[in-house]
Amino acid sequence: MNKNKRFAWKTQGVANKHNIISGNDWRFTVLTSRLIRMEFSNAGEFEDRATQIVFYRDFPDCTYKTQRQGTTLFIDTDHLHLSFDEAVGKESLQIHLKTLGVSWHYGQKLPPQLKGTTRTLDEADGSVKLEDGLCSRAGYTLMDDSGRLVLSEDGWFDRKKPEEDLYFFGYGHDYIACVQDFYRLTGAPSLL
């Protein structure tokens, strides 16, 4: 296939190795003290290419501590405490927000989110249903990047490796920092 020079984006999908903790079928990337990428793959294959949404995972070194007790992994940052039992799998995953004292468990329904934007106002006549946003009064949200296409080196879109790819945003009520780090991850939106 020919290289698509017209749509060759500058991306940095590969995360800083210092920020990665991994096992046979899982990988966690501590992007900031409040943003963690969580990947699960039965084949043990993980995706480092940029996706339709996530262009930049090359965040600087993040300060965190890891600890193991038997088969359970603990990751502590200034704001989050993650626990994961490798023997049980992703169903054991939970993240606790230290600042608000709330926890999220894998598979748990997310609390109501503050609304975001709509893609277009074309053909709108009156109110428009808004999509969920990144910010929540509960202090956390989850972005699922599993089904997105990846950007291949030749500038075309490609199918992603079969995996679950989640981003946990635990920013409490610091909505500005949440959106700033989202833009750091995705790139700033285009302006007209």
Tell what function each PLM region has:
Residues 1, 6-9, 15-18, 53, ...:
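A short linear-motif detector with a strong N-terminal bias
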Residues 2, 6, 31-70:
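A low-complexity, Ser/Thr/Gly/Pro-enriched, surface-exposed linker/loop concept
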Residues 8-37:
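N-terminal-proximal low-complexity accessory segments that begin disordered
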Residues 12-15, 20-22, 60, 67-69, ...:
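Residues that act as N-cap/strand-start positions at coil-to-secondary-structure junctions
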Residues 15, 30, 40, 48-49, ...:
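Low-complexity, intrinsically disordered regions enriched in charged/polar residues
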Residues 18-19, 52, 93, 100:
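Residue-level marker of intrinsically disordered, low-complexity segments enriched
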Residues 28, 36-40, 75-82:
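Short, well-ordered beta-strand segments enriched in hydrophobic/aromatic residues
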Residues 66-192:
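Catalytic and substrate-binding clefts that recognize carbohydrates or anionic sugar/phosphate headgroups
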